[in-house]
């Protein structure tokens, strides 16, 4: 096992910069996930680590060794590709043994290692089959097993679950986590799936357009995203972004005013007429219930009495069993935006219904509309 360190890694293809000044260090034994939309550079980073790409500039270390000029076969890393890259003419056992044979390991030890790995992945009954005789999930396990059999210092997995159906993907994701906990091998995992990123990672590296947006533990990034891009990418359903203007101590959203809490005014110090973007997750929007000053809980809560509802029009109702996802429209000055709201399954709504909601301002995010940078909290 080994740590992995990237120092200002840049990769250019003629006039195109795929990744720029990428720097981070993965401690020995940790599971890091590179996440971002297609074309953000995550696969280029992985291919650079494994040695399939050469950095235009910067330094790459595996353990204490600078590996810029070390060929892939000598880096002692193992990669699992999206399409598994199994040899179709070989049996499962031969696929598992391939990397060991290429390193001239003793045949007896190869057989022992293959059997051990196959048992650990519950594929020992498949050793004599060819890849075409396997399901997608079984092929994925064989690809993992081939990497494990080599006992590498670093695992690299490039979207290994993307070809699996939803249920199998969930099951295999849990198995991957258990496998890492058992083996403790430094792992770099590439995905565009934010659920995989949140559930698997010790640390997440958020990327866009070849640059790092944020690095951190999944829950800390979810709770305090550095910018709008990260905020809307992590979370399912995605965070709502509402264009607003600060005026008269309130947020003007379309033609509706939402009173701005004093705590936000004090920290944000907004200017009169300043354009802002309000971010709120669907689970932090509540159906508005009018309250009166006689309510015991509100007698000393002045702010609660000032809460102003937001009126929406229901467009789509998506029952999810344990709850319902509502997609509603919010009229703006020049167009309209879609707002997603999670409501209890007991709430019955239809397309065209009016829906009055209130935002949980304790869970509100505010972004700069020009740069996307987080301004609050």
Predicted segments, located by residue:
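ABC ATPase nucleotide-binding domain
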Residues: 5, 25, 61, 356-358
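The feature captures the beta-strand-to-loop junction immediately N-terminal to the Walker
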Residues: 35-37
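Helix-to-loop junction immediately C-terminal to a conserved catalytic motif
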Residues: 50
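Conserved coupling/switch loops of ABC nucleotide-binding domains, chiefly the family-specific signature
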Residues: 56-59, 109, 209, 364
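Conserved ABC transporter NBD signature motif
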Residues: 58-66
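ABC ATPase nucleotide-binding domains
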Residues: 72-229, 233
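Non-catalytic connector elements of ABC transporters
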Residues: 250-377
């Amino acid at each position: 096992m080994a740590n992995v360190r990237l120092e200002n890694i840049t990769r250019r293809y003629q006039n195109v910069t795929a990744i720029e000044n990428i720097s981070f260090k993965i401690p020995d034994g940790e599971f890091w996930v590179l996440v971002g939309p297609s074309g953000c550079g995550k696969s280029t980073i992985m291919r650079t680590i494994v040695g399939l790409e050469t950095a235009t500039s910067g330094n790459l270390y595996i353990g204490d060794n600078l590996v810029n000029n070390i060929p892939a076969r000598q880096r002692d890393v193992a990669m699992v590709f999206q399409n598994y890259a199994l040899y179709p003419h070989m049996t499962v056992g031969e696929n598992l043994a391939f990397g060991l044979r290429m390193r001239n390991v003793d045949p007896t030890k190869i057989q022992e290692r293959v059997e051990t790995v196959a048992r650990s992945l519950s594929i020992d009954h498949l050793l004599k089959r060819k890849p075409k005789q396997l399901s997608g999930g079984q092929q994925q396990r064989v690809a993992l097993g081939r990497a494990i059999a080599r006992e590498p210092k670093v695992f690299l997995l490039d979207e290994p679950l993307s070809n699996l159906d939803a249920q199998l993907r969930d099951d295999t994701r849990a198995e991957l986590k258990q496998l890492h906990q058992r083996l403790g091998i430094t792992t770099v995992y590439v995905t565009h799936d934010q659920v995989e990123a949140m559930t698997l990672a010790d640390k997440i590296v958020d990327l866009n357009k070849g640059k790092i947006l944020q690095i951190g533990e999944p829950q800390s990034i979810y709770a305090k995203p550095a910018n709008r891009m990260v905020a809307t990418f992590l979370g399912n359903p995605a965070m709502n972004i509402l264009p607003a203007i600060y005026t008269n101590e309130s947020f003007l959203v379309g033609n509706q005013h939402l009173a701005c809490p004093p705590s936000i005014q004090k920290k944000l110090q907004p200017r009169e007429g300043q354009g802002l973007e309000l971010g709120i997750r669907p689970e932090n929007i509540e159906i508005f219930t009018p309250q009166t000053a006689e309510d015991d809980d509100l007698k000393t809560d002045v702010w609660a009495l000032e809460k102003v509802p937001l009126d929406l029009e229901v467009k789509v109702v998506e029952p999810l069993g344990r709850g319902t996802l509502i997609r509603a429209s919010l009229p703006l000055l020049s167009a309209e935006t879609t707002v997603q709201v999670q409501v209890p399954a007991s709430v019955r709504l239809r397309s065209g219904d009016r829906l009055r909601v209130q935002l949980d301002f304790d869970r509100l995010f505010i972004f700069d509309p020009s740069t996307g940078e987080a301004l609050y909290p």
